[in-house]
Amino acid sequence: MEVLQASSLSFQLLRRHSRNNLINKFRNPSLPRIHMPRQNIDLKTFAAITPTVACPPSEPEIIPEKKEDKFEWYENWYPVASVCDLDKRRPHGRKVIGIDVVVWWDRKENAWKVFDDTCPHRLAPLSEGRIDQWGRLQCVYHGWCFDGAGACKFIPQAPHHGPPVETSKKACVKGVYPSCVRNGIVWFWPNSDPKYKDIFLTKKPHYIPELDDPSFTCTMTTREVPYGYEILAENLMDPSHVPYAHYGILELEKVKESAKRDREGGHELEIRVGKIDVNGFSAKQVSADYYFVPPYLYYGRITPNTATKAIDVTLPVVPEEKTAMIIFYCIPVRPGYSRLIFAGARNFAVQVDRFVPRWITHMSHNLIFDSDLFLLHVEERKLKDLDWHKSCYIPTKADGQVVAFRRWLNKYGGTQVDWRNNFTPALPPTPSREQLFDRYWSHTAECSSCSVACKRLNALEIGLQAMSLVFVAMAAAVSAPATRYSMVAMAVLSFLASKWLSRFIHKTFYNHGYDHAFI
């Protein structure tokens, strides 16, 4: 499992064909740098091990397991949503590690709250409700209202002079989860037991200083994908798939074709993986350092310098003595589905993001997601009932991080996400390609930038169609041939522009699809 540098999203943002036009190519945003204390880590060149290899290559060292060294999936913070995509005027529904939650802004406490997405009355989803005029979360099924602590404050159907039924514990929201905001992301602790009420004081979500550093620029993207957490994580850690699965999307260094080198430029990768323990692992690739902090975080810091002589086409181009960060928050949603929050930060070309709308950047991000989406969806189903280590042939060092992640998952994570018997082992059936490549519900509807852009461009499309009709009417009303021809030409141009815009809107915000054969 290769680290973040190989991640498709990261490449799309940072990769430039040449360093001189890095700023001009705004659609490929870059990444910032993470402050990590230097550690004396014993790094070993990682080689994957499979039963079919005659001479097993060297393996990363796994720290001997202690009795308590088992990863606890429900004793960690989980990212729910990026703050930039949340609207304080309404509640938002999300599913994280199988738990349906509602995120809403409590204006009395000036804080984001995370509740179980269930009204105690008739179990309707609170995320379909609203924030009332007093700042309470209101269930729109029967109007019950709740404060930031989950206490019921109003039951419209209760007699005004009768017993205060809203004060009953049964009227309170059953799950009020600890929550916080860190690095521009709302987090929650997936256990509503009162003993975890102040868990933030003793255990905090992993912090990346560069995401809050004003000298860095950062762009965030969120996308839900139709494959599970395990497949998502290993794909992000796999740099060698980038020149192939994302061919024609990312601008990679050009390589000279030869008998042993194809047009895509794939080549041998030297990846060194450090010790693996319950807290994850680190890895090194040329001028990039990567870190896996389970269960959700995988990030890399790319810091080239004049001493770096090796060229790696799987790494984004970063100016010398500058830093780029690629940060991935991998969120298990339910079996067969996961969510990714990607943050790309950098301390160069900072002004670009101030002039380029976020939805423009998301166009290329979503195209990267689409380009390997079907591959990963099918791969997950083929691996479902197989032993990964015995079924996959992994003879090269390029898959070092992928193997390291699988070893961590088997050794400490129980081989898969702990769903607590909330789901059956079976994966959901494969939907149609149209549904698989859906962008609207997996991204646009929940993205503050893309949703607004979609509405405005739809309005522009309608405006162009109306203009076409107006020009036709004007052409019929005038008698001068030259003026009539001009009106007809304008009507045709307006109609063609509306058709082009309609196709652009559909491919950008609703459904794009992908066919590798003709790229």
Swiss-Prot record:
It comes from Ocimum basilicum (Sweet basil). Fe cation binds at H241, H246. Pathway: Flavonoid metabolism. GO terms for biological process: flavonoid metabolic process. One of its GO terms (cellular component) is cytoplasm. This is Flavonoid 8-hydroxylase 2, chloroplastic. It catalyses: salvigenin + 2 reduced [2Fe-2S]-[ferredoxin] + O2 + 2 H(+) = 8-hydroxysalvigenin + 2 oxidized [2Fe-2S]-[ferredoxin] + H2O. The keyword Zinc-finger does not apply. Binds 1 [2Fe-2S] cluster per subunit. It is found in: Plastid, Chloroplast membrane; Cytoplasm. Its EC number is 1.14.15.-. Rieske-type, PAO-family oxygenase involved in the biosynthesis of polymethoxylated flavonoids natural products such as nevadensin and salvigenin, aroma compounds which contribute to the flavor of sweet basil, and exhibit pharmacological activities such as anti-allergic, anti-oxidant, antibacterial, anti-proliferative, and anti-inflammatory effects. Catalyzes the hydroxylation of salvigenin to produce 8-hydroxysalvigenin (8-OH-SALV).
